[in-house]
Amino acid sequence: MVSKISEGVEVSIETFYQKDYSNPLQNEYMFAYRITIENHNSFPVKLLRRYWEVFDSNSEHRIVEGEGVVGVQPLIMPGKHYQYVSGCHLKSELGKMQGYYTMENI
C-alpha cells in the first residue's frame, strides 16, 4: 500500500493483478486498485475531480480525468473516509499511475 497526505487529506492505494481478466498472450493485463481517501481535517471536504496519468513499460501513456470518482463526488466528513475500487488495463505487465484529486473545503 502507498499513502500520501496533503492538506489534511490522506490518500492510500492498494493494487491487485486480475489474472482472470488478463490475457498475457495478447498483451492484455488488468489491474484493480482500491483507493481510500481519509479526511484528517476539522471540516468536511468534497472530491470534485480526478486526474490520472497511466504509464506501462512499453512507454504507452494515457490520461484519465473527469468529475468525481466512479460516478460520485463524495463529501467526506472530518475523521471519516471514502473508499472505492476501480480498474486499469495495461498492454504490459508493469506500469504506474500518478495523479491528483481536486478537493473543496466545505
What is each PLM-predicted segment?
Residues 1-28:
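Low-complexity, acidic Ser/Thr/Pro/Gly-rich terminal tails and inter-domain linkers that flank the onset
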Residues 2-3, 36, 51-53, 100-102:
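Residue-level detector of beta-strand face positions
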Residues 22-23, 44, 91-95:
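Short glycine/serine/proline-enriched coil/turn segments at secondary-structure junctions
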Residues 29-34:
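Short, solvent-exposed loop/turn segments enriched in Ser/Thr/Gly
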Residues 37-41:
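Asparagine-centered strand-capping/turn motif at beta-strand->loop junctions
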Residues 43-62, 103:
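Short acidic, flexible loop segments centered on an aromatic residue
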Residues 62-94:
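Intrinsically disordered, low-complexity Pro/Gly/Ser/Thr-rich segments with frequent PxxP/GP/PP motifs
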Residues 89-106:
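Terminal connector regions
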